[in-house]
Structure formats: C-alpha cells, structure tokens
Amino acid sequence: MLKHPTLNLLQQLGLAGMADAFTRLADNDESDNLSHGEWLALLLDQEATWRNNKRLALRLRNAKLHHPAVPEDIIRRAPREYDRTILDLLIAGDWIRKHENCAIVGPTGIGKSWLACALGHKACRDNHSVLYVRMPALLQSLEQARGIGSLATRLKSLGAVELLILDDYGLQPIDGNAPHYLLEILEGRYGRRSTLVTSQFPVARWHEKISDPTYADAILDRLVHNAHRLEMSGESMRRLRQPAEIQT
C-alpha cells in the first residue's frame, strides 16, 4: 500500500506525532467531516503531546529515580503522620521555582525515599531537570572523580540540575574530603537550584554528622536555612509491603 505524500513529508521532517495522528485520522471515516483547520489543529496537538511525552521520558531517565513513585499514589499508601499542608506545598512545586530546599526526615522504612522520588517525578512533569542519588554513593563517586581529574566537571553537572535529591543524609560519617565536596555542591546551588535531602536523623542532629564543625556550619546554613521540613512518622513500610515495594 502506497503512503500518502503528506505522511511521507511528515516523517521526513521528523514530525512523528503528526505522522501518527495523520495515519489514524486517515483511517477514520468520521474525519471526513473535519475542516482543514480542524485537521491541522488535531495534528499540531498530537505533535505537541508526542514531544512533551518524549521530553518527559528523557527527564525521568536522566533523573534515575530509585522508586517508580508518583504523587497521585501518596494517599493510597499506608497511613502516615505528616503535615499535609507542607506536603501539598511540596507537591505543588513552587518551592522548586523559587530555588528553595526541602528536608524529609523520619525513621527507617517510613517511606522517605519513596516520597522524595514521587516529588522528583512531579518535578520532571513540571519540566524541571532532576537527579536522585544516595549521599554515600555520591560522596564516594566524587572522591573517585578527584582521583581521575574530573571533579570540577562532576561538581558543575551537580550544580546545574534543577532538583537534586540527596537520599540518606548522615547514614555514613561525612568526613575526609566529603565536607568540602558537599559544601562545593551546596554553595553552587544555594539560591539558584533546589536540593531535597532525606534522613533518618532529625535536622537538629545533622551538624554532628559532619566531622569538621566549620564546614558543618557552612553546609547547614546553605542547606537548611530556606528548607521546607517534612517530618514523617508511622509504622515501617517494610512490615506492611511485600518485598517488591520495600522502601528506605
């Protein structure tokens, strides 16, 4: 079967969304009743949708979110105790546009990482670049980058992402070169980008997790000063969910 010349042109121009819509409309007898303007409007709408979906898929892939979490699922999960007003504010996402930070704290297994990933997913849908990383792994990778001479490049890339999710703050001591790395990240992001941190330790104990008090003061000033704080409590999700849904 020969292709319609218009379909060939759409494909040659890389207008995949319009090409797909053209094929479906051409196969639909009811489309004969549409005016030229209505045809064009439908094709353009499908192209815009296709491009938006493609960009979203790319942002989600680059975000490397640890959990397939979305904010719409929050109310369907096991009961949690938290400030709903703060959670609604975080989901709305204005804090990211204002380059503010977020701290989510609570006991192990409460679902902090899952919630952070849900907020990350929403940020991707809001056209923000996102990156999820566990803090112990991040600090280790920065030490390795220093060893091969790519530390500056790595720090620059971390400074560019619009929402950086640092999971498991304080799980391991922040010592050696780690305080310097963390300060460099936050200094470059403060007032320019947003950082979301999760921790099983209350914010009041974050200072003691950093070996150098001077660095600790500087780090927390940039991290906590403009942060929205969400404290979670409740039963561990590890006791409530099957292994495939284990949370941290």
UniProtKB/Swiss-Prot annotation:
Listed under GO biological process in this entry are:
DNA replication
SUPFAM superfamilies of this UniProt entry?
A: P-loop containing nucleoside triphosphate hydrolases
What's a Pfam family this protein contains?
IstB_IS21
What the entry lists under InterPro entries is as follows: AAA+_ATPase, DNAC/IstB-like, IstB, IstB_ATP-bd, P-loop_NTPase
Sites where the protein binds ATP: 106-113
Superkingdom field:
Bacteria
Q: Name the coiled-coil region(s).
A: none
Keywords, sorted A to Z: ATP-binding, Nucleotide-binding, Plasmid, Transposable element
Please give the Gene Ontology molecular function terms for this protein: ATP binding; ATP hydrolysis activity
Annotated family: Belongs to the IS21/IS1162 putative ATP-binding protein family.
Protein's recorded name:
Putative insertion sequence ATP-binding protein y4uH
Organism, per UniProt? Sinorhizobium fredii (strain NBRC 101917 / NGR234)
